[in-house]
């Protein structure tokens, strides 16, 4: 397994499956009251240039739940805002902590930290990839539906960082993935082409969301305007209007289809209130699973 978690493209399908299986095991053990101390005496630095609720709390809870300690640094708490070279920060932080979890804008930040750090670097989100979230999502799908290789997974909306990580996961784990995105909002072309060449099942890009969701087992949606895109909000709401996950769309999916949303949700925009609060939506189980998945990731890379 790689020394860092930069993107899912760096892993084999077996390595991804092993991480998810371990997360499910850790969740089950916690439900039985088993407490873990695998990372006692170790510390991790959370460097978050982008603010977060779920990602921060789930990583902190995961580290504490394994007996470790957490140091949280916002963008204001580091010298990055004053243009400190990343290679300097990486080497200094490596002498203070046992791992670095980064939530930032450019993927190049994670890549350079990983190049110079002597401790594991974990990508908690960039504009290009969101690997930890997709691992948590897949864990949720497996819990609810069984083997993911037998399922039709559909991504509806912006071809953003989550879409890119879903594409890489589909290639590695061998499941069918359909992405429905408006023209001009496609996932990364290089990531898509590489995954289509590698994957055992089709990875397809469509424009029409109603066609994409026909018979879908899993529908995955995210906000139409991500953090940093606030100035595009009004335009995006118009462009993505037909990509809203609502009762009409759900009627075209399989009867037992589930809906994923990483949260926070903008009710009435990318998803309607009735779907988000309905029995087919598993967003809150998905949110819980971030903590268990992060435990498995921290245990693997820092243990």
Curated annotation (Swiss-Prot):
Matches recorded under PROSITE patterns: CARBAMOYLTRANSFERASE
User: Can you say where in the cell this protein is located?
Assistant: Cytoplasm
Q: Which cellular component, as a GO term, is one annotated location?
A: cytoplasm
> What positions does the entry give for L-ornithine binding?
161, 222, 226-227
Where along the chain is carbamoyl phosphate bound?
Answer: 52-55, 79, 103, 130-133, 262-263, 290
Is this entry keyworded Cytoplasm?
A: yes
Quote the PANTHER family the UniProt record gives.
ORNITHINE CARBAMOYLTRANSFERASE, MITOCHONDRIAL, ORNITHINE TRANSCARBAMYLASE, MITOCHONDRIAL
NCBIfam families linked = orni_carb_tr, PRK00779.1
- Family note: Belongs to the aspartate/ornithine carbamoyltransferase superfamily. OTCase family.
- Could you tell me what this protein is called? Ornithine carbamoyltransferase
Q: What is the lineage of its organism?
A: Bacteria, Pseudomonadati, Thermodesulfobacteriota, Desulfobulbia, Desulfobulbales
């Amino acid at each position: 397994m790689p020394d860092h978690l930069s993107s899912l493209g760096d892993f084999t399908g077996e390595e991804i499956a092993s991480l998810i299986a371990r997360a499910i095991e850790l969740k089950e053990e916690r439900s039985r009251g088993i407490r873990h101390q695998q990372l006692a005496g170790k510390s991790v630095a959370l460097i978050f240039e982008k603010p977060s609720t779920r990602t921060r709390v789930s990583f902190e809870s995961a580290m504490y739940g394994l007996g470790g300690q957490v140091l949280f640094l916002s963008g204001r708490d580091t010298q990055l805002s004053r243009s400190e070279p990343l290679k300097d920060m990486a080497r200094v932080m490596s002498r203070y902590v046992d791992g670095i979890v980064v939530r930032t804008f450019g993927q190049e930040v994670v890549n350079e930290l990983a190049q110079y750090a002597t401790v594991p670097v974990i990508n908690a989100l960039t504009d290009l990839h969101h690997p930890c979230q997709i691992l948590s999502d897949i864990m949720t799908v497996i819990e609810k539906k069984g083997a993911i290789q037998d399922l039709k997974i559909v991504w509806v909306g912006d071809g953003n960082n989550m879409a890119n990580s879903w594409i890489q996961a589909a290639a590695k784990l061998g499941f069918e993935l359909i992405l429905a995105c408006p023209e001009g909002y496609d996932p990364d072309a290089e990531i898509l082409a590489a995954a289509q060449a590698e994957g055992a099942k089709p990875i397809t890009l469509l424009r029409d969301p109603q066609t994409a969701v026909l018979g879908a087992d899993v529908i995955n949606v995210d906000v139409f305007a991500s953090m940093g895109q606030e100035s595009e909000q009004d335009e995006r709401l118009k462009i993505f209007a037909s990509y809203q996950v609502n009762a009409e769309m759900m009627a075209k999916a399989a009867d037992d289809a589930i809906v994923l949303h990483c949260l926070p949700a903008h009710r009435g925009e990318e998803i309607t209130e009735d779907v988000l609060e309905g029995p087919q939506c598993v967003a809150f189980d998905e949110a819980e699973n971030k903590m268990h998945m992060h435990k498995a990731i921290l245990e693997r890379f820092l243990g």
